Curated annotation (Swiss-Prot):
Gene Ontology annotations for the cellular component aspect, listed alphabetically: cytosol
GO molecular function: ATP binding; glutamate-cysteine ligase activity; metal ion binding
InterPro entries per UniProt: Gln_synth/guanido_kin_cat_dom (IPR014746), Glu_cys_ligase (IPR007370), Glut_cys_ligase (IPR006334)
Top enzyme class: ligase
UniProt similarity note: Belongs to the glutamate--cysteine ligase type 1 family. Type 1 subfamily.
Keywords, comma-separated and alphabetical: ATP-binding, Glutathione biosynthesis, Ligase, Nucleotide-binding
Lineage top rank: taxon: Bacteria
NCBIfam families noted in UniProt: glu_cys_ligase
Pathway, per record: Sulfur metabolism; glutathione biosynthesis; glutathione from L-cysteine and L-glutamate: step 1/2
Gene name tied to this protein: gshA
Biological process according to GO: glutathione biosynthetic process
Protein name: Glutamate--cysteine ligase
Organism: Baumannia cicadellinicola subsp. Homalodisca coagulata
Catalytic activity, reaction form: L-cysteine + L-glutamate + ATP = gamma-L-glutamyl-L-cysteine + ADP + phosphate + H(+)
Length: 523
């Protein structure tokens, strides 16, 4: 059932310790700004944090109040997490009577009218980013778009591909490297449900989130008023969060990069009836970028994405096709409410271990049928992952097996890899993480979702969220910066505003012509 990393591969890894030296990592963390009463902040993005359009490390996602922090790429885990913490510390110093909401599912919201679209200035690029968000609002509702998460970016070093696959350089051997990452992604789809099982932290939602929404989910109402599913792990990953029916027809199986790009480009240029009914414009004002299945590739909701840094006006899909996959973006992480920065070292080490295992383990091609079954498994884990005796579909749909059995097999498979990784580093950190998290299989009460649900029942979502938000705010406020300094942040703030002004001055096309140009480049 569980594909094993062969003893030959482990022997090779032990004999080539340099292969995994220099893994590139990065974190993107989203968080809502709230006032001290627990309501969504109604203030614009603080000017002292720089221009959201052009700042390297501090921007906004869907809403003006939805902050997004982006770490520089780092090779050391502690270094990366310290950079992330420094960004949080800096932001805490520049919030006025506001805190950062510490959970994935939103705080109390009286009305969707309180959710203001992120603003990026009058440049064509800035207006397009806001219009894209307006399209998301019109397609899926604003409430769904202010769910927060953590994205983990992961890239294996060139030395790995050189030794593992005989690659000489990134450019001439891009197809080999891309094939390796696609194998990782296929195994991630097959077994990545382990991430929401262990780290999912959104088993409940504020009642305001469900206002005017129909659902068949059998919610239980807690005494404090919030709604929850007793065995849920990540409602953020469910149909309540990032899901839509228009994308269910996209038959993306990650068997080849060309196929992946072709199917996404097809979605970007194929009209969709529901979105055509919304319309492109109303009273001369744009309602969305276009009326197609996807406005752009960013609209694809997936638990993992292949990525490549773009050049100039290049689209992300063209960049992938021309130069291959550069890194992968893990998108299945809820905000860790027990961490001031939404993620901790234990999670990063587990992700490293799991992603390396996904790369080294056999990853046969995936049929459309198997992809459907993997999605069903994810859904079961997301909605009832801690349910005793829960079974998952295995062997391409031919049989079922208890989650607990598969989970133990998975950890056994990763244990040997953890030992090999630790032998390179002269410690037992990966083995410790493997041993500790393995206990979550037999003891689901140790998972993040079980732990946070227990606290939610005790204090309510609002009470717990405010307590943690205030606690983390005070901690971050009192801690000194370690990697960055205030001068660095000041310089980046000034640079970001100058760059935004440059973009505004460089515009030569009307917004209509600019949009037509962008849409034609996505064909």
């Amino acid at each position: 059932m569980i594909p094993d990393v062969s003893s030959d591969t482990l022997f090779w890894l032990k004999a080539n310790p340099q292969a995994l030296q220099g893994i590139y990592r990065g974190v993107e963390r989203e968080t809502l700004r709230i006032n001290t009463q627990g309501h969504l902040a109604q203030t614009p993005h603080p000017k002292k944090l720089g221009a959201a359009l052009t700042h390297k490390w501090i921007t906004t996602d869907f809403a003006e109040t939805l902050l997004e922090f982006i770490t520089p790429v780092a090779q050391d885990i502690d270094h990366m997490l310290t950079l992330l913490r420094d960004i949080h510390r800096h932001v805490a110093r520049h919030l006025c009577n506001e805190w950062m909401w510490p959970m994935s599912m939103p705080c109390f919201i009286d009305s969707q009218q309180q959710i203001k679209l992120a603003q990026y200035g009058p440049s064509n690029m800035g207006r397009m980013k806001t219009l894209y968000r307006k399209g998301l609002k019109n397609r899926y509702s604003a409430m769904m778009q202010i769910i927060s998460g953590v994205h983990y970016n992961f890239s294996l070093p060139l030395t790995f591909w050189q030794v593992y696959a005989g690659v000489s350089d990134m450019n001439s051997n891009k197809d080999i490297i891309s094939a390796g990452y696609l194998g990782l992604i296929r195994n991630y789809y097959r077994f990545g449900w382990i991430i929401p099982y262990i780290f999912g932290a959104s088993p409940g939602v504020c009642q305001s989130f469900m206002k005017n929404r129909d659902t068949d989910l059998p919610f239980i109402k807690a005494s404090s008023g919030f709604l929850y599913l007793p065995y849920a792990t990540s409602l953020r990953m469910s149909d309540l969060g990032y899901a839509n029916k228009s994308q269910s027809q996209l038959d993306i199986t990650f068997n080849s990069l060309k196929e992946y790009v072709f199917r996404l480009k097809h979605a970007i240029r194929t009209p969709y009836a529901d979105y055509q009914r919304i319309g492109l414009k109303k009273n001369g004002s744009y309602l969305q970028l276009n009326t197609n299945i996807l406005q752009s590739e960013n609209e694809l909701y997936a638990p993992i994405r292949p990525k490549r840094i773009t050049k100039n006006e290049e689209s992300p899909l063209d960049a992938l096709l021309r130069r291959g996959i550069e890194y992968i973006e893990v998108r299945a992480l809820d905000i860790n409410p027990f961490s001031p920065v939404g993620i901790d070292e234990e999670q990063v080490r587990f992700l490293d271990l799991f992603l390396i295992w996904c790369t080294l383990a056999p990853a046969p091609k995936m049929s459309t049928r198997e992809l459907l079954y993997t999605r069903l498994n994810w859904t079961k884990v997301i909605l009832e992952g801690r349910k005793p005796g829960l079974t998952l579909i295995v062997d391409g749909g031919s049989s079922k097996k208890p989650l607990a059995t598969i989970g133990k097999e998975l950890f056994s498979a990763m244990q040997a890899l953890a030992e090999t990784l630790d032998s390179h580093n002269g410690n037992i950190q990966y083995q410790q993480v493997c041993h500790k998290l393995r206990a979550c299989i037999d003891q689901p009460e140790l998972t993040l979702s079980a732990r946070i649900l227990k606290e939610m029942k005790k204090y309510g979502i609002r009470g717990l969220g405010l307590t943690l938000a205030n606690q983390y705010f005070q901690i971050l406020l009192e801690e000194p910066l370690e990697m960055f300094n205030e001068l660095t942040f000041d310089k980046e703030q000034i640079r970001s505003w100058h760059r935004q002004l440059e973009l505004e001055a460089l515009d030569i096309l009307s917004f209509d012509d600019f949009l037509a140009h962008i849409n034609s480049h996505q064909q």
